[in-house]
Amino acid sequence: MEITLFDPIDAHLHVRENALLKAVLRYSSEPFSAAVIMPNLSKPLINTPTTLEYEEEILNHSSNFKPLMSLYFNDGLTLEELQRAQEKGVRFLKLYPKGMTTNAQNGTSDLLGEKTLEILENAQKLGFILCIHAEQAGFCLDKEFLCHSVLETFALSFPKLKIIIEHLSDWRSIALIEKHDNLYATLTLHHISMTLDDLLGGSLNPHCFCKPLIKTKKDQERLLSLALKAHPKISFGSDSAPHFISKKHSANIPAGIFSAPILLPALCELFEKHNALENLQAFISDNAKKIYALDNLPAKKVRLSKTPFIVPTHTLCLNEKIAILRGGETLSWNIQEIA
């Protein structure tokens, strides 16, 4: 059995920087045509020059791959700065509520404050797309749900602004997407295939710790259903986020799952299991092209076959290991050719 996927798109990707970028980028740049690149670096991408520098670094270490750059939402995003970014091809803003995830200490503390709303008004006028880490302070399993009132306010106040709920994790958010024309979402492999049991049902597995948390069986099943039918307002976004094993095995575990090396084989396996392979093309590419109005992307054909793929346990960077999701397991699908 074989399947060919055309122009895969990852609508939410972390490729880090410097040596770590060089170590992990190929896992995404080789099989994917494009990816929306997250701006939460150690020094966040708060303006056009820093964003373009990072874009150049990615382009210097990849080929036939389009990084879709995003700006880190901050009070310095004046109308002039947004116009400058737009002129250079930057179309995405990423809003991090302060302290909600990795490198979000510089995030937005007042989501409905006057400055935030002013920036969103300008973003709407210029046709930016707003990607939001939709969590607010509260009980860990309810953080996305607690952000619903903010999402509704944004959707109603800025009806022409496309708003993406990144890494949808709570089944209660589905109704919001279906209610508001300008609300969309991305789904990760881990949120549609894993639950809290994978994180802490046995021994604690730090390599399954992410934000937002993987949640209950009901959440996983409802989100998987969206993916399997390639809901037109949903696109695939891996949120692949590598960390060194030494950090993952520390007393202060960073959030992030490194899934990039297995994404397409694992999705084929999952969709085949549920008799939905015919919808994988839409989920992995077609929906994103429509939602984000993407064209002129590098053309790619990725041929996968139903042959065993033993997932490596890790990859290396500067003699440090980075654990790979499902490392040591055997997947039933594997990439045979990328053209």
Curated annotation (Swiss-Prot):
Cofactor(s), by name: Zn(2+)
Name of the gene this protein is made from: pyrC
Assembly description: Homodimer.
Keywords (A to Z) from UniProt: Hydrolase, Metal-binding, Pyrimidine biosynthesis, Zinc
Pathway: Pyrimidine metabolism; UMP biosynthesis via de novo pathway; (S)-dihydroorotate from bicarbonate: step 3/3
GO cellular component, one term: cytosol
Organism: Helicobacter pylori (strain Shi470)
Protein name (Swiss-Prot/TrEMBL): Dihydroorotase
NCBIfam families reported for this sequence: pyrC_dimer (TIGR00856)
Function comment: Catalyzes the reversible cyclization of carbamoyl aspartate to dihydroorotate.
Any one GO MF annotation of this record: zinc ion binding
Binding-site residues for substrate, renumbered to this chain: 14-16, 40, 133, 243, 255
Origin: domain of life: Bacteria
Residues the record marks as active site: 239
GO terms for biological process, alphabetical: 'de novo' pyrimidine nucleobase biosynthetic process; 'de novo' UMP biosynthetic process
Residues where Zn(2+) 2 binds: 94, 133, 167
Family recorded in the similarity comment: Belongs to the metallo-dependent hydrolases superfamily. DHOase family. Class II DHOase subfamily.
Residues annotated for Zn(2+) 1 binding in this entry: 12, 14, 94, 239
Modified residues (N6-carboxylysine): 94
EC code: 3.5.2.3
Gene3D superfamilies registered for this protein in UniProt: Metal-dependent hydrolases
CC cofactor note: Binds 2 Zn(2+) ions per subunit.
Catalytic activity entry: (S)-dihydroorotate + H2O = N-carbamoyl-L-aspartate + H(+)
Top EC group: hydrolase
